[in-house]
Amino acid sequence: MRLLMSQEIMFKYIFPDLAAIQKESFKSFLLEGLSEVLDSFPIIVDPTGKLELQFFGKDYKLKFPRYSVRKAKSRDKTYSAQIYIPAKLTRRDIEVIKENISTSKDLSYFFNSQDINKKYRKRPVFIGDLPLMTNRGTFVISGTERIIINQIVRSPGVYYKKELDKNNKQIYSCSIISNRGSWLKFEIDSKAQIWAKIDKNHKVSAYIFLRSIGLNNEDIRKRLTKYNYLINSSLTYYKKEFSKDVNNVDIEKITEEEALVIVYSKLRPNEPATLAVAKQMLYTRFFDPKRYDLGAVGRHKINQKLNLKVPTHFRVLSPEDILVSLDYLLNIKEQNIGTFDDIDHLGNRRVRSVGELLQNQVRIGLNRLERIIRERMIICDLDSLSLSNLVNPKPLMASVREFFSSSQLSQFMDQTNPLSELTHKRRISALGPGGLNKDRAGFAVRDLHPSHYGRICPIETPEGPNAGLIGSLSIYAKVNRYGFIETPCYKVTDGQVLKKDKLYYITADQEDYLRIAPADISLDVNDFIQDKIIAVRYKQEFITATISQVDYMAVSPIQFISAATSLIPFLEHDDANRALMGSNMQRQAVPLLFPEKSIVGTGLEAKIAKDSGMTIISRTNGTVSYVSGTKIGIQNKEGYTIHYRLKKYYRSNQDTCINQRPIVWPGENIRIGQTIADGASTDGGEIALGRNIIVAYMPWEGYNYEDAFLISERLVYEDLYTSIHIERYELECRQTKLGSEEITRDIPNVSEASIGLLDKNGIISIGSWVDAGDILVGKVTPKGESDQLPEGKLLRAIFGEKARDVRDTSLRLPNATKGRVVNVKIFKRQKGDELPPGTNEIIRVYVAQKRKIQVGDKMAGRHGNKGIISRILSLQDMPFLPDGTPVDIILNPLGVPSRMNVGQLFECLLGLAGEYSSKRFKIIPFDEMYGSEASRALVYNKLKQASSMNDKSWLFNALHPGKVMLVDGRTGEFFDNPVTVGKAYILKLVHLVDDKIHARSTGPYSLVTQQPLGGRAQHGGQRLGEMEVWALEAFGAAYTLQELLTVKSDDMQGRNDALNAIVKGKPIPKPGTPESFKVLMRELQSLALDIAVHKLELLDNGNKASIEIDLMSDEQVSAI
C-alpha cells in the first residue's frame, strides 16, 4: 500500500518526459536544422564561369539504416543513415550546343546532347552518413552506446557590464556577442574615451568605427542622445593619433573612406590599407550572413534588450543595432538609465542540445566540402568533372565521426542502472568547445544563482574540479526553442491558484519581474491562499507580499531538484553536501539479482523507471495473449498481436547485467502506457536500486570505525546483494606474413583436460563454467624459423620431421576471474561480415559472474552515508530485536551528528513502521506545510500505530522513541543502552573489491626505465614514492631501502641473480646499478656534461693514480 503525503501536487500531467530534451532536440535537427544548414550551402561557380554546382538542401533524403540498433551493437557498427541531397551541375556554355542542334540536321549532335543532358541533370548525390538517435535518446557509435550531453554557454546578444580596470577605476562596456563570427565591444574607459573593440584585441575610436560602417553625422546625431559626449571623447584621441596623417582637423568632417582606412590599419597594421579591401573586410566581419550569424536567439535577445523590432530572420548586425546599443551604454554611464547584465543569470545562458551541436558539426563538414569542390574545379578538366567525382562525402563523414568519437560532449553512456542512464541524458555541462575550461573557471560561474531555481539542480554536481561546471536539469524543467531553460508555474489571480488552468512555463529573465509564491503554502479547498501575507521571490530576492500581489505559484516543493535528488526521502533534513553524495551514489548502485522497491520513497520511482527506457511500456490497449521469458504478445481491439522482445542477460557499458522480466500474465487487460516488463534495477515498474534491510546504529568491537559497515551473513546466503556482471573477451584471427592464424581444438603442448570444454571448432560451449586460465578459444599462429627453440631445431635436424610450426596464442580467462559462458558470437569474412583489414574471423565470448557481497565492497544509503564492509558476522552473533529478528547491518552512530544527514534516521524508523504495518510510504520532501516538525510527528505516529497493530510495545517506547533495547547475540544479554534500529534502503555500489584487489610478484617492466609498470590493468606494482623513502630513512632501514630501490625495481642484472638465488636456495647477491641511474647518466651526457667517478689508488712508487670507474658496469661498481 502506498501513502501519499501530498494531495494534488503530484499530478501526472505536470511531469514532462524526462528524456525528452535529447529526443526533441534531435527531432528538430532532422526537421529544421539539417535542411537549414544544407540549404545554406552556396552555389559554387568555377573561376572561368562555365561550371556551376547547386545543392537543393531542403529536399534532402535519408536512406533507411543498413543495420538495426541490435545488429549495429553486435557487429561494432554505427547505427546511421545515408544523406542524399539533390544537386545539379550546370554548364553555362551548353547553350551553344543547343543552338547547334536546332540549326543542324546531323543526328550525332542529337546523341551528344542526350549524353550532356544526362550528365548535367538534377539528381541525388551521397554526401555522408548521419548517426541516428535510438528511441531511448542514445547513439550507437562503433557498437557502443553514447550520449551527447547538453552544453550551457553564454547566449548571443548584447551585454552591459561595469568593472574595474588595472588602476581600480570604473570602466563601462557593451559587448555584442554573435553565435558565429566576430565579437564587437564598446568601452568607456576611466578617461571618458569611447572605444570600439573588434575580437577583444584591436581597438579604435567608437566615432571612427561608426563612420567606417557607412553612418553619416546626421544618422549618428539622430540616434545618439549623447552625441556631443561621443564627439568630445573622440577628439582627444583623434588629435593625438591621426592629426598628422589625416588632412582634416575637425573630427566631424572625417570621411567614410578615411575612417575605413584607419580601422583597417588598426586591424591589419602590417598590410597596406586600400579602400576596397577595407570595405570588404568590415563587411565580412559583421554584415556577411556567411561569416557572421547572431542566430535566432541573438536577434531575439538584442530586440528584447534594446526594444527593437528587427525581424528574427535578419541575423546579421544592422547599423541601427550598433547605434542603439552604443546609445544605451552612454545613457547607463551618464544618466544611470538602463540595467547591467549578470552573465551568470540563466536568462543570459542557454542550452545547446544534441541537435544544435550536430548542426554546427555538419556546417564545419560542409565548409570543408565547399573548399574541396572549389579546388577540384580549378585543378580538373571541366569536361571530366561530374557530380560523382566533384562531391566527396569524406569531409562531412570525418567531421561527424570526429564529433561523436572524440568531442568532450560525446560520452560513453553510463548504463550502471536506469537512474544513471536518465541522469546522463539530462546532464548539463559548461565545458567543451565554445565553453569554459575547468582550470580557469572561477568561483562565480560555479556558484549557485537565484535564477537556477526550478531550472538547474543546486544539489547534484560532481565533487572535485568539475564542481558547479556540470549540473543536472531540474525535474520539471524544459528547454524552449531558443535554448533557455523554463520552469512551470500556476497562475494566481486575486489570491486563487488556478490549478485547473494550463501550466505557464517561465524563463529566468521573465521571472525577475514576477512575484512567485513557493509551492508549500497552505491553500483552502477552493485553492485560495490562506495566509494574508506570504514570502515570494521577486527580482532574485525573497520579499513579503499580500496575496493580491502574487502573480504565480510554483507547482511542487521538489521543483528545484533533479531526478536523482528527488528520490531521496526526508531530503530537507540532510546537509547539502551529503545530499550531493547521496544523489551521485544512487547512480553507482549496481543492479541486484533480486531487486526490491523501497518501503520509504518519494513517489517518483515509477516515473523515473518509465522514462529511463529500461522497462517495457505497452504501446496499445489490449489483452495479454502470450508471455514467456523472452517475449510478450498483446492483442489489441482490432485483433492484431503486438510482440515485445525482452532483453536477456545483455552486457551494459559498465559490465553490469541488463535483464528484462515480464510482470503480466496471459489474459490480463493492459492499458496504453502500462509497464509490462521490469528491467535491471526495477521492481513492479518502480526503480529499485537496493534492498530494505534492518539497520542498527551502534558501535560493535571497533568494526565500524571510520564508517565501516558490519553485515550479517544472511545478506550473503540469501543473495540479497548478489549481482551479475558480464565481461566480454574478444579474439581476432589475423592473416600474418607466415600464413593465416587458425581457430582450432588442436593446440600444441596442451593437455586434453584443458581443451575439454571446447567444441570441435576450438570454441568454448555456451553454459560452460570457466575458471582463471581456462581456454575460451583455441588459436594457433604460424611461427618462423627464428621463433623455434633450439630443442625443436635439433629434433627436426635429427628426424627430419616437419612438425607443426605453430605457437599457442589461445584466448584464456584472465587471473582472478571465473564465471559461466552466456553467449558466443562468431563473425567471419567468408559469411559476408565486415571485418577490419587483415582479420579473417572475430570471436567474442561473454562470461557472466555472480558476485555475492563480501568484505571490501562499498555500500551506501540514499543520504550520503557510505562505507566499506569490514566484517561479515555469523547470524547467531548479530544483535537481535526483542522478537528475535537479527539485525542485518550495523552502522557507526558517530557518522550522523557531524555529517548532519539526519534524514537517514527518519527513513529507517519509518521503514521499520512500514515493515511491521505492511505499508509503503511516499514522502514528498519539504513537508513543513503540514505543520512544524511534520516529519517527526509522522514517524512517531506510524511507529505507534505499528506497535499497537502488532501488539509489540517495544516498537514505540515513549521514554526513548525510535530506540529499542537490543540483545547481544553472543551473550544473550541486553545491551546497556537503547539503540536506534530501523529498516533502511541500502545500496551496493559498483566499486566492488573484486575489481580493485591486486597483487604482483613478477610482471611487465617499462622499456626505458626498466621499472615495473603501474596500475591493475598492466599488472603493475605499487610505487615506492618519495615519502615512503623518507619513512624508511627515518627508521634506518638501509638494507630494506636498498633492496626496494634496486633488486625489486630496476636493477636488471640484480633481479635476475636474486631470482636464481631464491630458486636455488643460495644467499641473495649484492645489488648492482639501477637502470634509472643509467638513464640519468645518459641524459646528462646528452647535455654535454661529463659525469664520472674516479678511484684514487696508491702506486708502489708512492704516487697517486686516478682510475675512472664505468658506472654502467655492475662489476666495476661492486668492486669499488
UniProtKB/Swiss-Prot annotation:
Q: Where is the signal peptide?
A: none
Q: What is its main location?
A: plastid
State the InterPro entries in the record.
DNA-dir_RNA_pol_bsu_ext_1_sf, DNA-dir_RNA_pol_bsu_external_1, DNA-dir_RNA_pol_su2, DNA-dir_RNAP_su2_dom, DNA-dir_RNAP_su2_hyb_sf, RNA_pol_bsu_bac, RNA_pol_bsu_CS, RNA_pol_bsu_protrusion
Give the keywords, sorted: Chloroplast, DNA-directed RNA polymerase, Nucleotidyltransferase, Plastid, Transcription, Transferase
- Please give the start and end residues of each transmembrane region: none
Its catalytic activity? RNA(n) + a ribonucleoside 5'-triphosphate = RNA(n+1) + diphosphate
GO cellular component terms, alphabetically, are:
chloroplast; DNA-directed RNA polymerase complex; mitochondrion
Q: Please describe what this protein does.
A: DNA-dependent RNA polymerase catalyzes the transcription of DNA into RNA using the four ribonucleoside triphosphates as substrates.
Self-association and partners: In plastids the minimal PEP RNA polymerase catalytic core is composed of four subunits: alpha, beta, beta', and beta''. When a (nuclear-encoded) sigma factor is associated with the core the holoenzyme is formed, which can initiate transcription.
Q: What is this protein called?
A: DNA-directed RNA polymerase subunit beta
Q: Which organism is it from?
A: Gracilaria tenuistipitata var. liui
Coding gene?
rpoB
